[in-house]
Structure formats: C-alpha cells, structure tokens
Amino acid sequence: MEKITSFTIDHLKLQPGLYVSRKDKVGTEIVTTFDIRITRPNIEPVMNTAEIHAIEHLAATYLRNYPLWKEKVLYFGPMGCRTGFYLLLAGDYESADVVKLIKDCFQFIAEFSREIPGASAKDCGNYLDMNLPMAKYWAHRYVALLENADNSCMLYPV
C-alpha cells in the first residue's frame, strides 16, 4: 500500500503550527485539511484525551457559529497521535487565510469559563472525559504561537 500523505511529513522536524495538510477535490469543490499542531511530535508530551475532548467540543461549537466561516466548516477533530487537530474547510485555502480564525478560536477556548457545550450524557458519548483547565492551558499556549505566525510554523518542514 502507498504511504498516506500525513505519514510523509518528517515528524522529527515538525514544530507546533498551522499547516495545510492536504487539498482534495470533492465534486467541483476543493476541501482543505488543516493540521493544527499543538505539541511537537515525539519531543513534547502529547495532550490527554480529556483536554482534547474539551477542545474538540469548544472549537467545533465556536467554528460552526463563526459568521464568516460556519458554512465552510466540514469537520474539526483530534489527531489519533494526540498532538493536534484537523480542520476541514470547503474551499481552497492556505494557512495565512485562516490564522485569524484559528487564533480567535483558541483565544475563545483559553478564556472559556462556562459549562462546555454538549458536555452532558444526553449530548455526548463520553461527557465525563473533559478537562477544561488543561484545554485552556493548551489553547493559551497555541495562541501565543500564532501571535507571531510566519512560514516557520505554517509550512511543513522539508
């Protein structure tokens, strides 16, 4: 079998950042997949499932309610390796096009202090596995990275 695109990235060189993982043509539309890399693979500790789950609920809710982008959001969810998230948007975009959106999203998470949307037995299959304080920690750290975002954290290493 062929190696999938995400496994061709040198994870030993990969830093936290906001990357275009791939672009796919679906019918007449382009779908852009973003790699929202929070931790440095194989170097820094990975996120635990509880904070990943909290970030997933908060980011998905935020993005699907963001007036300029909500109609473009197809999916937001965690990477299996627990070092980040994927965001799929309808349209042909580059990292620079969405850095403000992602920064605003993670700022929202960093400042969030209410009940996590969908964190109930009725709404979620594992609602007790949430850690808002750690989600806020990772979000705050990621916002700090995006404050000075440049090509070093928006283009995959060669």
Residue ranges of predicted features:
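His/Glu-rich zincin catalytic helix
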Residues: 1-63
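Context-gated lysine
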Residues: 3, 13, 23-25, 70-72, ...
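M16/MPP (pitrilysin/insulinase) zinc-metallopeptidase core fold and M16-derived inactive scaffolds
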Residues: 41, 45-97
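Detector for Asparagine
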Residues: 42, 48, 65, 126, ...
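A domain-level signal for the structural core that forms small-molecule/cofactor-binding pockets
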Residues: 62, 121-124, 155-156
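Active-site-adjacent, His/Asp/Glu-enriched structural segments that form or flank metal-binding
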Residues: 76-148
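Histidine-acidic residue clusters that define the catalytic metal-binding segment
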Residues: 144-158
